[in-house]
Amino acid sequence: MAVEQDIFDAVVMADERFHGEGYQEGYEEGSSLGIVEGKRYGMVHGAKIGSEIGCYRGFALAWKCLLHSGAGEKDSRKMKVVEALIALLQDFPYDDPTYEKLHEDLDRIRGKFRQLCSLLNVQPDFKVTPGGSGLAF
């Protein structure tokens, strides 16, 4: 009689056993795919932020050179904003993706960039496209 119960237990418990094995296999495969997908997402997102920051830096350095040559009273305010933007860009943590205030600093840089564009009467249109990124005026 005990042998008959063991046979039926194996049949009855097969569903639970297969469920557990399937869950474990799915969990392992999902974990490895999640790491790959997360890495790919991080690379793409990081490249977009890097492209945006690089564009702001080039814009600020170009205007610094242009404003330096014509150092008038109006240009001194513009020059202060340019230098403030450059300082924000230099302090940006390029090598630390775990930096807690990354998005706050990025928003501050974007705000300073918009302020500079307003002072310069420039309407920027920053776009990241598959062909590259940049500003359009």
UniProtKB/Swiss-Prot annotation:
Modified residues (N-acetylalanine): 2
Location of the protein in the cell: Nucleus
Region (deca-GX3 motif): 22-58
Gene Ontology CC annotations of this record: nucleus
A Pfam entry, by short name: Yae1_N
Keywords annotated in UniProt: Acetylation, Nucleus
A single GO BP: translational initiation
Keyword Oxidoreductase: no
Cross-referenced InterPro entries: Essential_protein_Yae1_N (IPR019191), LTO1_adapter (IPR052436)
Entry's family note: Belongs to the LTO1 family.
Binding partners and assembly: Forms a complex with YAE1. Interacts with PYCR1 and PYCR2.
Function: The complex LTO1:YAE1 functions as a target specific adapter that probably recruits apo-ABCE1 to the cytosolic iron-sulfur protein assembly (CIA) complex machinery. May be required for biogenesis of the large ribosomal subunit and initiation of translation. May play a role in the regulation of proline metabolism and ROS production.
Protein name as catalogued: Protein LTO1 homolog
Source species of the chain: Mus musculus (Mouse)
